[in-house]
Amino acid sequence: MTANYDVLIVGAGISGIGAAYHLHRQCPGTSFLVLEAQADFGGTWRTHRYPGIRSDSDLHTFGYRFKPWTGPPIASAAQIRSYIGEVIEANQLGPHIRYGHRICSARWSSQENLWTIEAIRADSGATVCVTANFLWM
């Protein structure tokens, strides 16, 4: 069975969650899904775990305009992940995110004006098929 969405967002890092927020708030009625390969949100701030990892840009400009950063200008990965998590929680974005879904193909059909995306589920190895009018990467 294929699930159909207006927009498919690739990744639940800071950019993907920002995209999800804007779709949720500014485009009511638009169906969207975020596919994340990892077991949780955070992108780089989840996967890079070396000692002392932190932003190299200040979070006052790197953060979301809709949720101004209130912490220290240069933040740790844990602080950034917490910030992203607050956005997910406060805006009920969780139901739109599927963790453990690694995209293995994305094909555009000019005839149908539609993306067909296939992802592999980490928990079962099953292939999931999603179609979308717009692919946000």
For each of these PLM feature ranges, what is it?
Residues 3-34:
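N-terminal Rossmann-like FAD-binding beta1-loop-alpha1 element of flavoenzymes
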Residues 34-43, 131-137:
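Carboxylate/His-rich catalytic cores and anion/metal-binding grooves
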